[in-house]
């Protein structure tokens, strides 16, 4: 039995892709090991609007993870202690200097210095809290690499505890920078989402022996009722193309909508179902929509599962994805997937012969949809390939087993370099 501490900026009841993944994996690990969670944000608080010129110019949002962080109470979920490491009122003085680089002129001319300076302030407050929680711990796993991840790494180094991080971001994209990449060799292990990400980090100088693929897990209800879903939404005996996600342009919603008219030229009874919250930019896209367009908005996890199980094709031709769990969910029900050219997605979909990765244009999307609807055998084969992939590599037991093996290996591995990031 090992003692494992996860360090994450946010955790349940805060809800997000990373938080859901962390909760699933932690619960499964807790069946055999002592697992605890340390997090700064355990709620739903979003940055509040600060009126006037100051509110518009200052980087107010960045302060809600440190200086303006809410105070939460620790609790226990099943066998897992969830420790809140949010700052006390008395910690505010130590974090006060973090306010300075939010001023536009200072940020513009001294950003590298303030990145370093801010972290020193942050570590002075959060480091001791994390060190206290790490007493007797065998492995520290940092989820995402921000100031809390840096503090978790430094605390683990100070106590001689091996550490691993899973950045949950693709190399070179939003959420990662050169300072973060320079930090990776200090961890005993770094988890990447795909082999493509692993190769990219190797090319950027991260030692290959430090890099391990740690997949994500599809989020599925216990049972689904696709027939009931089709009956409820008047979709009986018609082809159904499903989109699940936020209605943002980069997700491919607008392009998919436009593709429908081209699909109807060949397959006029095809219906398009959109599940997910709206965005301000998307409101006009669905005005006066054809009756074969169904927008269901935000739904429960149960109804989302029913929708995926009921569709013929899952289509989300996104330009950017970090955790493409919805593709895995579609494959869990043997559905062929049409994705976009987001980093890592073509390798995931076409590399496993489980669908198509297309350009985000109505022409490319409609061609892929039409091809699948006109060739049921191909569609079934691609969906089955995806199902095999999920069962072999992305099941909860498979992902947890891989993490568990990595932790055990790290316990006997020499500590990584002690060089601090500057």
PLM segments and residue spans:
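Nucleotide-activated donor-binding/catalytic signature segment of Leloir-type glycosyltransferases, i.e.
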Residues: 283-303
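Short hydrophobic beta-strand element within catalytic cores of glycosyltransferases
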Residues: 336-339
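Aromatic "clamp/platform" in nucleotide-sugar-dependent glycosyltransferases that forms part
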Residues: 319
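Conserved donor-binding/catalytic core segment of Leloir-type glycosyltransferases
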Residues: 5, 191, 235-251, 257-260
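A short, well-ordered alpha-helix in the C-terminal region of glycosyltransferases
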Residues: 364, 371, 378-392, 399-405
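Conserved acidic donor-binding segment of nucleotide-sugar-dependent glycosyltransferases
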Residues: 351-363, 371-377
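Donor nucleotide-sugar binding/catalytic pocket of nucleotide-sugar-dependent glycosyltransferases
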Residues: 21, 39, 172, 180-224, ...
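Glycosyltransferase donor-sugar binding loop
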Residues: 44, 244, 248, 271-284
